[in-house]
């Protein structure tokens, strides 16, 4: 499958249409707003599959309450009935559920998952062709040597919640799709830095100046305060000490 998410500008719509028109029938554009259906139908010949993205509600700490992407929980079933149900060129196959903070064992995540499952159940009763649930957001990756996350428990519990809800509503369980960006590639690479010089700036703080910049090579450290496993390559027999790592730029955020 080729799952096409996000807001779609003209070129994106044209590229999706070219895939489908050239025979890639398992290309599924995920509808992000009410106008995208018209844009896609103007470019795609014949019948094609679509999905709908749920506009999830964010954690209280976010600066906004509802995701900018997708269609609100309460509007999805009515949107399907008005614009999709009687359209013979459209086949709804997928509901897309994405949480910005990722999959975590928190009350917030389980609450949003339950709301998503309720939408799937309600939509499935109206739309027999719906058979896919795409769970985005992804698992966390190891960011310290003390990292402890029970992946198997989370997988089992998510599947269990979906199955219980579907069984109670007497609807078929969906095929599960996942989009785990960081989890998939987070440990596929690394960065090597050389310590050029150590500065003792006060009684408690030592700075190891490196031959690079965290702003350019590890931007998540300053942009979203992401932590990474940082280990010495050599001198493991030396006495350990607490240090701050400083990048080469003059920017005050260039440190770890």
Segments predicted by a language model, with ranges:
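Short glycine/threonine-rich loop-to-helix capping motif typified by GTGT followed
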Residues: 105-111, 142-154, 185-199
């Amino acid at each position: 499958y080729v799952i096409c998410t996000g807001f779609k500008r003209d070129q994106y719509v044209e590229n999706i249409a070219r895939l489908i028109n050239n025979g890639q029938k398992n290309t599924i554009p995920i509808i992000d707003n009410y106008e995208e259906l018209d844009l896609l139908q103007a470019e795609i010949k014949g019948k094609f599959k679509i999905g709908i993205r749920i506009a999830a509600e964010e954690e209280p700490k976010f600066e906004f309450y509802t995701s900018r992407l997708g269609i609100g929980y309460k509007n999805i079933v009515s949107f399907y009935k008005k614009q999709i149900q009687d359209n013979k060129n459209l086949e709804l196959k997928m509901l897309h559920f994405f949480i910005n903070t990722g999959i975590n064992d928190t009350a917030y995540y389980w609450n949003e998952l339950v709301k998503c499952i309720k939408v799937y159940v309600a939509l499935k009763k109206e739309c027999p062709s719906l058979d896919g649930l795409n769970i985005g957001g992804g698992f966390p990756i190891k960011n310290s040597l003390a990292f402890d996350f029970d992946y198997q428990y989370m997988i089992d519990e998510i599947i269990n919640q979906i199955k219980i809800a579907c069984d109670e509503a007497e609807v078929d369980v969906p095929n599960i799709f996942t989009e785990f960006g960081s989890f998939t590639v987070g440990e596929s690479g690394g960065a090597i830095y050389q310590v050029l010089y150590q500065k003792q700036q006060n009684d408690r703080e030592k700075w190891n100046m490196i031959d690079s910049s965290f702003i350019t090579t590890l931007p998540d450290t300053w942009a979203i305060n992401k932590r990474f496993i940082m280990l010495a390559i050599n001198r493991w027999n030396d006495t350990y000490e607490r240090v701050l790592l400083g990048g080469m730029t003059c920017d005050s955020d260039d440190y770890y």
